[in-house]
Design a protein with these regions (language model features):
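Transmembrane beta-strands of outer-membrane beta-barrel pores
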Residues: 1-2, 41, 52-56, 158-162, ...
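Outer-membrane beta-barrel translocator/receptor signature
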Residues: 1-60, 64-66, 132-138, 149-150, ...
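Residues that define the transmembrane beta-barrel architecture of outer-membrane proteins
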Residues: 25-31, 132-136, 235-237, 328-332, ...
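Short loop/turn motifs that connect adjacent beta-strands in outer-membrane beta-barrel proteins
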Residues: 40-43, 147-150, 246-253, 341-354, ...
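Surface-exposed, low-complexity loop segments enriched in small/polar and acidic residues
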Residues: 55-73, 84, 94-133, 139, ...
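C-terminal beta-signal and terminal closure region of outer-membrane beta-barrel proteins
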Residues: 267, 275, 456, 469, ...
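Gram-negative outer-membrane beta-barrel transporters
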Residues: 551-715
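C-terminal beta-signal and adjacent terminal beta-strands/loops
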Residues: 562, 655-658, 706-718, 745-800
Length: 800
C-alpha cells in the first residue's frame, strides 16, 4: 500500500505521477532439485543439485517514498528535485546565466518552469529499486574412501546469472563534452537557432558571419530515445579435488587444490556518442537544408527547439558499448593434524593431550578486464568516462600452525580449561608480509557455564578490486556545491578558495556543480597497504541445568583497526583545504584547468575531488552480542498436547564506532548516528527475535520481530569533525523500525511439504532521508531498512 502522504504531496508540483495506491510487483520464482546416491560398496557418495531463480524488477517510481529525489533546504522545506541535466544551458565561462529551451527560444531557466524536457529530470521514474535477475546453479559433492589413508573428495559448482539494469536516459551532460572545458561547441550560424537564441548565448554579428562557436555546458536528456539499459552476465565455475586420511599413529592429513573462475560480459545500450553529438551540433545551412560541417553520414541534432529531434538524428548518435572480464583463483592447501597425547604431551591436570594442526597455503588471484573501443575512448555519454584495460594478479604464500592445549579438566571449579594458540605467516606478491596470531582461553567452572576470552592480531590485504579497479569520475552528493563557484549557498572567502586551485579572477565566476552534485574520482590504488586489526573479546555461554532448554550467550568485543582501506570523506577534504591550505588535502581537489569547475566525467579533463582508495586513519568498534535460545516447558502448565514452543533472540548493542579520518585528527563516534561521514545507519541496538510453535499436527508456525534502533543525524551532535551542534528540522532523528514476519510449514506427509508466509506484514516504509544526506545510491533512505514493503511467499517441497 502507498501511504506516505508527505512524499505524495511533493509529487504534484513537480508533475511526477503518483504510483498506484495498491501495487503487486517484484515477483520471484525459485526451483531447486537435490539428488543423492551411494556406491554399491558403501564407500562413496554423490550429491548433485540444481537451482533456478528469477526476480522481476521493481521501479523506484512504483513506491511513493522513492518516486522522486527528496531534497530539503536549510530551512527544512522539502521538495522533489532531480537533475538539471534535462533542459539547462549556460556558457562554460559562466557568463549570461542559465537558460532553457521553450519553443524555439531560450528563456531564463527556472526550477519551476514548464518546459519540455522539464527543468529537473526525475531519474527515479526509470531506475530500479530491485533489479531484474535470472540465475542458474548446478553442481555436485562427491567422496570415495579408497582406504583409511586415501579418502578422496571433490566438489564442483557452476553458476550463470543475467541481470538487466535500467537507468534514466542518456543525453548531453554538463561537464562531459569534448571541448577543453568539457563543454560542447555550438556555432553561432547554426540554422536551428533563432535570432533570440544567438543573442542569448552571446553571439555577435561578426561571430554569426564568421561561424564562431560558443563553448556551452548543456544538460539535455534524450527523452526521445528512452532509458539506458545495462546487461550483465556472469558465469562461475569452481572445482575442488582433494584427499584426506591417516598418515601414521595419531597423524592425519588433508591436501586439496581448488580452481575458481568467474567471467563477466557487460553491454551498455541506448547511449549517445559524445563525438557524434559534437559533430551534430556543428551545423550550417546547405542547399537542401541544414547539414553537418563534418559531412559524411552525420545527421544534424536539433535540440534548439521543442520537437526538433528526428529519428534519423537518434540513429546517427546511437552507440553501444561492451566489455568482458574475468576473475580467477587457484589454491593449493595442505595441513597435518595430530593428537600428541599418544606421546605423553599433555598437562598433568588434564585428561586430553595437546592437539596440533599445521600446514601451508598458496593462492593466486588474477583479474582481467577488456572494454571495447567505444568504452576505451570514453565516447559513451553518461557512462562515467573512459574505461581502461586491466590485467593484474596477486599471489600469496602462507604457513600456519595451531595448538589446542587442555590445561585442567574434571576438577572442582575447573571442569574444562583450554588454551588455543594460532600463528600464520603471509607473504604477498605486492610486497606485504605479515605475522598474525591468536590466543584464546576457555574456562568451564561447572557444566552450566563456560567463560571465554580471546585476543587476535590480524591483517586484511587489499584485494584485486581495491588495488586495480579502473578509476573513473562520477557525481556525488557528499559535496553538493562548490563553495568557490557562482551561487554557492555558503561561499568561502577568496583566500580560502585560492587554496583549492582557483585564480582570483575565477572566484565566484566558476560554473556551479549541477544537480547538487560535484564530481568524485573513484577506483583502485595499487599502492595500498594492508589493514591491521586487533580484536579482544570476552564472554560466556550459559546452559543451566536448573532451567532445562535454555542456552544463553553474551560476548563483549572490541576491534581496533589501523590503515583502513577506504577514502577520505570528500567533505573533510574540501573543508580542510579551505581552512588550512594543507597540500595533503588541497592536492586531492583537481579542478578543470580551463575554467576551474569541479564537475565532469573524465579523469584527464579534471573537475573532481579524489576519492580513490587509500589507507586512511584508524577506528575502533566495540559492542555486545547477545544470543538466547529457550525451549519453553509448556508441559509444566498442562499444554504438552499442543506441541513445543521455542524462542530465539539474536541482538547486538553497539557501544562505540569511532573513526580517526587521518593521523592526528580527533576521533568521532558514529554509534547511534547516521549521515554522510558515518556513511550508514549505526543504531546502538538491533535484534531479531523469533518464536516457533511446532504443533503435534505436522505444522510449524513462526513469528519474527526484526528491530532497528533509533539513530540521530551526525551533524546534530557535538562530535568532532562531523558535528555542528545545529538541529536539522527534517532529519534530526530516524525513529526505530520494527518489522513483523509470519510464516508456517505444513508437512503433509513424508513426501510433501508446503511453506508460506508474509514478511513485513505491517507494510512498514523505510524512514525518509534527505537524499543529499543519504548518498547511498538509493533514493531517500538507507539499504539497512526494508525497501519493498509487504512480501508474501509460498513454497512446495517433495522428497522422493
Amino acid at each position: 500500500n502507498q501511504h506516505n502522504e508527505f512524499v505524495q504531496s511533493l509529487l504534484g508540483p513537480r508533475q511526477v505521477a503518483k504510483p498506484k495506491e495498491n501495487t503487486w510487483d517484484g515477483a520471484s520464482r525459485d526451483l531447486s532439485i537435490v539428488y543423492g546416491a551411494n556406491t554399491e560398496d558403501g564407500r562413496g557418495n554423490v550429491t548433485a543439485f540444481f537451482t533456478y531463480h528469477d526476480q522481476e524488477p521493481v521501479l523506484q517510481g512504483k513506491r511513493d517514498w522513492s518516486a522522486c529525489q527528496v531534497v530539503v533546504s536549510g530551512a527544512g522545506v522539502a521538495s522533489c528535485a532531480g537533475s538539471p541535466n534535462s533542459n539547462q544551458w549556460f556558457r562554460a565561462d559562466g557568463q549570461g546565466g542559465q537558460l532553457a529551451v521553450v519553443g524555439n527560444e531560450f528563456v531564463p531557466w527556472s526550477a519551476t518552469g514548464a518546459t519540455s524536457p522539464p527543468p529537473f529530470f526525475n531519474s527515479n521514474e526509470y531506475s530500479y529499486l530491485m533489479q531484474q535477475s535470472t540465475r542458474y546453479t548446478a553442481g555436485f559433492f562427491a567422496k570415495y574412501d579408497v582406504n583409511d589413508h586415501f579418502k578422496l573428495y571433490s566438489d564442483f559448482s557452476f553458476m550463470n546469472d543475467r541481470t538487466n539494469v535500467q537507468i534514466a536516459p542518456t543525453g548531453l551532460f554538463q561537464g562531459s563534452g569534448p571541448s577543453p572545458t568539457s563543454g560542447f561547441l555550438v556555432n553561432c550560424n547554426n540554422p536551428f537557432m533563432s535570432g533570440g537564441q544567438r543573442t542569448a548565448i552571446g553571439c555577435s554579428a561578426d561571430d554569426i558571419l564568421n561561424g564562431e562557436s560558443v563553448d556551452m555546458y548543456i544538460g539535455r536528456r534524450n527523452i526521445e530515445g528512452g532509458g539506458r539499459v545495462g546487461f550483465y552476465e556472469h558465469q562461475n565455475y569452481r572445482v575442488v579435488m582433494g584427499s584426506r586420511g591417516d598418515i601414521v599413529g595419531p597423524w592425519k592429513y588433508d591436501l586439496y587444490g581448488s580452481y575458481y573462475y568467474t567471467s563477466l560480459y557487460q553491454a551498455s545500450q541506448n547511449y549517445l556518442s559524445i563525438s557524434k553529438i559534437q559533430n551534430a551540433l556543428q551545423v550550417v545551412q546547405g542547399p537542401n537544408g541544414p547539414v553537418c560541417i563534418s559531412g559524411g553520414d552525420c545527421v544534424p541534432y536539433n535540440i534548439f527547439q521543442q520537437g526538433g529531434v528526428t529519428n534519423e538524428a537518434l540513429s546517427y548518435l546511437a552507440i553501444n558499448g561492451t566489455s568482458r572480464g574475468a576473475v580467477s583463483q587457484r589454491i593449493v592447501e595442505g595441513s597435518v593434524t595430530g593428537d600428541l597425547s599418544e606421546y605423553g604431551v599433555k598437562s598433568p591436570w588434564a585428561n586430553d593431550g595437546v592437539a596440533v594442526n599445521f600446514g601451508f597455503q598458496t593462492r593466486r588471484e588474477h583479474l582481467e578486464y577488456t572494454p571495447d573501443v567505444a568504452q576505451l575512448s570514453g565516447d559513451l555519454s553518461g557512462a562515467g568516462g573512459a574505461s581502461v584495460t586491466i590485467d593484474e594478479s596477486i599471489a600469496v604464500t602462507e604457513g600456519f600452525g595451531e595448538a589446542r592445549i587442555p590445561l585442567i579438566q574434571d576438577v572442582a571449579w575447573a571442569q574444562d580449561v583450554v588454551l588455543d594458540l594460532g600463528y600464520r605467516y603471509s607473504d604477498y606478491s605486492t610486497g606485504i608480509t605479515a605475522d598474525t596470531y591468536k590466543v584464546a582461553l576457555q574456562w568451564a567452572p561447572i557444566d552450566d557455564i563456560r567463560f571465554r576470552t580471546s585476543y587476535n592480531q590480524a591483517i586484511r590485504a587489499p584485494n584485486l578490486l581495491e588495488l586495480y579497479t579502473p578509476q573513473s569520475v562520477t557525481n556525488t552528493s557528499q559535496v553538493s556545491s562548490d563553495p568557490c563557484a557562482q551561487g554557492a549557498p555558503s561561499p568561502a572567502s577568496l583566500a580560502a578558495c585560492l587554496n583549492t586551485g582557483i585564480t582570483a579572477a575565477q572566484y565566484q565566476n566558476i560554473p556551479q556543480c549541477p544537480s547538487g552534485q560535484c564530481s568524485v574520482l573513484t577506483g583502485g590504488n595499487p599502492d595500498l597497504m594492508s589493514e591491521e586489526a586487533k580484536t579482544f573479546s570476552i564472554g560466556f555461554t550459559l546452559t543451566p541445568t536448573f532451567l532445562n532448554g535454555l542456552t544463553a550467550s553474551l560476548d563483549y568485543f572490541t576491534i581496533d583497526l589501523e590503515g583502513t582501506i577506504g577514502n577520505i570523506p570528500l567533505g573533510v577534504i574540501m573543508q580542510r583545504c579551505l581552512e588550512t591550505g594543507d597540500d595533503a588535502f588541497c592536492s586531492q581537489i583537481v579542478r578543470n584547468p580551463v575554467n576551474g569547475a569541479l564537475f565532469g566525467d573524465d579523469v584527464a579533463a579534471g573537475g573532481y575531488i579524489n576519492g580513490a582508495n587509500v589507507n586512511v586513519g584508524a577506528g575502533t568498534t566495540s559492542g555486545v552480542d547477545v544470543q538466547v535460545n529457550y525451549n519453553l516447558p509448556i508441559e509444566m502448565i498442562g499444554l504438552e498436547d499442543y506441541g513445543r514452543v521455542s524462542v530465539a533472540l539474536n541482538g547486538a548493542y553497539l557501544i562505540e564506532a569511532t573513526t580517526i579520518p587521518l593521523p592526528g585528527d580527533p576521533e568521532y563516534d558514529c554509534a547511534g548516528l547516521f549521515g554522510p561521514q558515518c556513511q550508514t545507519v549505526n543504531p546502538k541496538w538491533r535484534h531479531q527475535m523469533r518464536v516457533n510453535w511446532t504443533t503435534p499436527w505436522d505444522m510449524t508456525f513462526s513469528a519474527a520481530w526484526r528491530y532497528i534502533g533509533e539513530v540521530k543525524l551526525e551533524t546534530d551532535t557535538q562530535e568532532p569533525t562531523i558535528g555542528t551542534g545545529a538541529t536539522n528540522p527534517f532529519n534530526h532523528t530516524l525513529p526505530a523500525r520494527s518489522y513483523l514476519d509470519l510464516s508456517g510449514v505444513w508437512n503433509i506427509n513424508d513426501t510433501f511439504t508446503v511453506r508460506a508466509g508474509v514478511n513485513n506484514i505491517l507494510d512498514q516504509d523505510p524512514p525518509l532521508v534527505n537524499s543529499r544526506i543519504a548518498g547511498t545510491g538509493l533514493p531517500n533512505t538507507y539499504p539497512t531498512y526494508d525497501l519493498l514493503g509487504r512480501k508474501m511467499f509460498i513454497g512446495f517441497t517433495a522428497n522422493f
